[in-house]
Amino acid sequence: MTWIDQAINGLKRTDIEMIAYLPDTTISPLVEAAKDDDAFETVLVTREEAAVGVLSGAWLGGKRGALLCQSSGLANTFNALSSLSMPARLPFLGIVTRRGDLGEFNLAQVTSGYNMPELLDDVNVRNHSVHDEDNVEERVRMAATTAFSTETPYVLLMETTVTGYKEESK
């Protein structure tokens, strides 16, 4: 079973109903799988911090939601997480493809991507890096359980050892 199939299963098993996303090459197969599955309502957002608002509204309306994006985009959410989600106890799950580390060719991805776990720690958003494709479903379920039981955001960073990496065009 691929990491994508496992992630979809983990989302379903934890009653995630809404997916907010920004397209990216690496996360696109997961986004497409969610869009093709009737279990999810998908919402394309123009900026990642808008997803925090969409998912906060979903929670207030009785739905659980998840954000799918890449790590450089996740950095755009920090103000919304710090000023809305954290103080108002509005949970969501982030499934984020990690850029800026192993296999990275784009220097612009390194600044926030390489340091993303520490940056999330600095804004008090719990996070976990997933390095092994074999346990994606379990990690998604565990992260969602933590996020929704504690009413706080939780981010899973999907490492390139799971997702593969984006190769430089020549």
Q: Model regions: which residues?
A:
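Thiamine diphosphate
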Residues: M1-K170
